[in-house]
Amino acid sequence: MILSGKEILKHIGEDIVIEPFSEERINPNSYNLTLFNELLVYKNETLDMKIPNETEKLIIPEEGLLLEPGKLYLGRTNEFTQTNKYVPMLEGRSSTGRLGLFIHVTAGFGDIGFAGYWTLEIFCVQPIKIYPNTEICQIYYHNIDGEYDLYNSGKYQNNNGIQPSLMYKDFEK
C-alpha cells in the first residue's frame, strides 16, 4: 500500500526524513524532489563494470544547461532522505517524462534504512535544457509486510553527493 500525501506529512521528522522539506511539494500520494546544481558525466565512452570509471563534474547554471541525447548524466536531489519503516520509491514526474527526460534508468527502488541523497540517472531522447532546483522527480513510500532488516550496504549509504557506479566493489568480494 502506498502512503497518501497526508500520511507522508504525518510521518515527516519521525519515520520519514526529507531535508529540506516544504509542505507545498506534497502531492496526493508523493512528494516532489528537486534537482541539485551539479551533474557528473563519464569521461570515457566505453565503461567497465570491474573498475572505477572516471567522471567529470558539470555545473548547471541558473540560465540552464543543454543536455544531449544518447548521453548519461548523473545528478542528485537537493533533498537528503531517510526512512526506517517504509520502502522509498523514486519516479520521474509526468511533466518531465512528457519532455522526453528520464530521471532514472533502473534505480528507482530504495531500501528501508537508506539514508542519503538520491542519485539520478538522467537521460533524454532529444536535446533539452534543464535548470537547477527544478521539481524533477517524486518520492513515494510503500508499507512493508513481515520482518525485515534495514539497509546497511556501505556502498551508497550516507552519501554526500552524486554517486557514480560502485559496481566494481561487487567484484572485490
Curated annotation (Swiss-Prot):
Active site per the UniProt annotation: 121
| Site positions for Important for bifunctional activity | 108-109
Indicate the enzyme's highest-level EC class: hydrolase
Q: Does the keyword Hydrolase apply?
A: yes
Per the record, the pathway is:
Pyrimidine metabolism; dUMP biosynthesis; dUMP from dCTP: step 1/1
Tell me the GO molecular function terms: dCTP deaminase (dUMP-forming) activity; dCTP deaminase activity; nucleotide binding
Q: How does it assemble?
A: Homotrimer.
Listed HAMAP family: dCTP_deaminase
User: What name appears for this protein in its UniProt entry?
Assistant: dCTP deaminase, dUMP-forming
Tell me the gene name. Answer: dcd
